[in-house]
Amino acid sequence: MKQFRFIDLFAGIGGFRLGLEAVGGICVGSAEIDQQAIKVYRQNWPTDRSEHNLGDITTLQQLPAHDLVVGGVPCQPWSIAGKNQAFDDPRGQLWADVIRLVRINQPKAFIFENVKGLIDPRNRLCLESILDSFKAEGYNVYYKLLNSFDYGVAQNRDRVFIIGIQQKLGVPDFSFPEYSESEQRLYDILDNLQTPSIIPESLPIQRNLFGERIEVGFNKLTPRGAFNDFFILNDIRNGPTSIHSWEIYATTEREKQICTTIMRNRGNPRYGDCDGNPMSYQDIADLVVDLAESELQVLIQKRILRQYEDGKYEFFNRRLSGGIDGTYRIFLPHARFFGRLTARGMHDEIAEISVSGATAEAYKQNFIQQILIPKRHRPITVNEAARIQGFPATFKFHSNQSANFRLIGNSVAPPVIMALGKALPNDHLFEPELCEV
């Protein structure tokens, strides 16, 4: 395996570095300004010289001698759920600095990572501008949306990767790495989970002619005909693995009927333009026979409903991702992946045991009785989050736990970077005599 030198821009805690060092890369400089990230980075690479951190990329010009430049460019402006400010946001302007550094230093190749929002149709002009800028500097450019799950990471995490290779090198076209399915389960990588004797039947992942995974069912990583291996706690959606507050709290059959009726009808356009709308007492009374308003007041006392100033009723837990009592999804130990780790934190937890069932309803009731009611579920730890992201168990963090979760959520998954590093045509890119350090 040939060695090559690389610059780690927006280094974070070193996800790119871990992946590239595993395939012969030698980091000759990193750039990061987040002090908490720098502290974690230094803990894990303590022998780096002080000048190894190049600092703020907006002030950089000439970089240390290198072959490859990599980095996860700050991505918030491209969020599909955000305001799509893109280049109008100062963080979006960092792309201009990346392009400038490529122009000045002319690396043989580069790898840049971003959120999937970058390839959203609303951001098409911005993406084309980035690609055209790199092409104008003499690079063949390739991009693709990759999911970490396809490269052995226990996480459903989509990211866009942009690869550039100098045209004048005349190397073969770049091909993104083949998928590498993993048989691991969460009980293989998380702590103190019970290995189930029976795992609910799953079918093989289905792929199209291009090898891309076919999205099926309620969750794209759950095979058709199989049970989800997680449960969603929410009051605004229904499904075989959805758990509602009225199924958890003490409620009568009549109260369950009222809640289910509201859930099924709140999206009706007659009540408003939103996906789910508050409903008046009369709206609900038209659907529930002999409804007394006092019945709705009891559901308010049980923190299932709330009432607005205009008198309309809505579920207390009205946000899907907010879950119930702060928990959104609970993954079972036999699950093949955990929820997507984010810098803003998450409301997902892990169950201590797995359950099964002959039918969807039996599966759901076994979960409620054996896991939910006895509270046999918990948040994941920092070290578990790191392993879910593909970091080694030996990776070191500092004492600020909330900062650690943020840093992990911001990081790239090292196994994906390792796969991309292996896919580079290094026999043509990296000559031995140019790799002395």
UniProtKB/Swiss-Prot annotation:
Active site: 75
Methyltransferase found in the keyword field: yes
Enzyme class: transferase
Protein EC: 2.1.1.37
PROSITE patterns named among the record's database cross-references: C5_MTASE_1 (PS00094), C5_MTASE_2 (PS00095), SAM_MT_C5 (PS51679)
Domain of life: Bacteria
GO terms classed as biological process: DNA restriction-modification system; methylation; negative regulation of gene expression via chromosomal CpG island methylation
Keyword annotations of the record: DNA-binding, Methyltransferase, Restriction system, S-adenosyl-L-methionine, Transferase
One matching Pfam family: DNA_methylase
Domain SAM-dependent MTase C5-type: 4-431
Molecular function as annotated in GO: DNA (cytosine-5-)-methyltransferase activity; DNA binding
Function: A methylase that recognizes the double-stranded sequence 5'-GGWCC-3', methylates C-? on both strands and protects the DNA from cleavage by the HgiCII endonuclease.
Homology family: Belongs to the class I-like SAM-binding methyltransferase superfamily. C5-methyltransferase family.
Protein name as catalogued: Type II methyltransferase M.HgiCII
Organism: Herpetosiphon aurantiacus
Gene name in the database record: hgiCIIM
